[in-house]
Amino acid sequence: MDTVSATLSAAALLAIPEDKPERLFKGGPDEVKKAYRTLAMRWHPDRNPYPGARAVFQHIQRMLGKAEEKIASGDWPCRGVLRLAAVDGRTYDIGYLRRHRFELGAMAVANTVVAFEIDRAHADLVHRAERAIRGFRFADDRMRGQIGRHLPGFPFAGAFRTGTGNAYVIVMRKRPDLLLLRDVLDHFGGRLDPRHVAWVLSSLLNLCCYFHFAGITHNAFSPDTCFMSPSDHSVAVLGGWWYAAASGERMVAAPANTLAWAPHDLLCTRRAGIRTDLELVRAVGRELLGDISGARLARESAAAQAMIEWLRLPAFDDPIDEYRTWRTQVLHDSFGARRFAELPLTQSDICD
């Protein structure tokens, strides 16, 4: 197991939810068993004189049980091989690094691709995603080069219906340096350094400016749809395109997270608008700082006051204005002069 997990304190171990064993155990089934043996030897009450050792040991046992349940059901998020049989008889093997369930199906994150399995009941949303991604437009090649790398490419690396007919599979290309925000957030125990949150939000706000130009809305920004590159401080939005719509178009679906944080009038009009994406940028920022509601951020000094205030204020409907205020006022008041904050993190750090 990784050194960090092996040396976690009793309080840190007990703080890990029982239903999130992947925050403690990394790798495949063999690595999980090895990690458990290491932790069990350290925390067994017959070997450890710490008064709370029994509670820690029992907590570790319960997390092992949850890990074994997830492995047996195919829901274990760490390394494995996903075998998919297509309706044409061909078989595809995807060696994934992380795997996650989401509201429409499952997602497997590999080194150079990410595969989405969408339940058959949501076929119409798959077609909407394909139309949105195929329809990206750019003012010129310079814009295409600057913005295109933060969006899914088309044609997809793969797209097919499974042989059982129960799911559609979309395989998107992914740069090896891109890490799912959810995995990064879990790796750091549910809270990121505000300096890194800042550049994630800068990248998302920049994308909102492009969406405004292109007349589209994404409607599903979250740590489960966005990927970050620690090496070049950028974000790519590869997931969630099932909910994309043209500005002003009537939305046919939205995930629960969007309904929770979108402008109130969205529930009444159901019309897509850029303000929804701008509100979700703020929600992403709050979640990365440890509290998506924003209620505890100031009390816990999760970031500078200027940043916290901006994250808790309602968004306006002009992304260019929002981006300008963020860059010239909020970032300056929060961090002073611009400096590159290194984040030495790779996929192997998360998976091994």
Feature locations, PLM:
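Catalytic-loop of the protein kinase fold
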Residues: 208-230
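N-terminal J-domain/J-like co-chaperone modules of DnaJ/Hsp40 proteins
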Residues: 1-47, 59-73, 77, 81
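Conserved N-terminal boundary motif of the eukaryotic protein kinase catalytic domain
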Residues: 78-99
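Conserved C-terminal segment of Hanks-type protein kinase catalytic domains
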Residues: 317-334, 342
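C-lobe/activation-segment region of protein kinase-like
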Residues: 235-317, 336, 340-351
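Activation segment signature within eukaryotic-like protein kinase domains
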Residues: 200-201
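ATP-binding glycine-rich loop module of kinase domains
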Residues: 95-149
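Conserved structural core of kinase catalytic domains
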Residues: 152-195
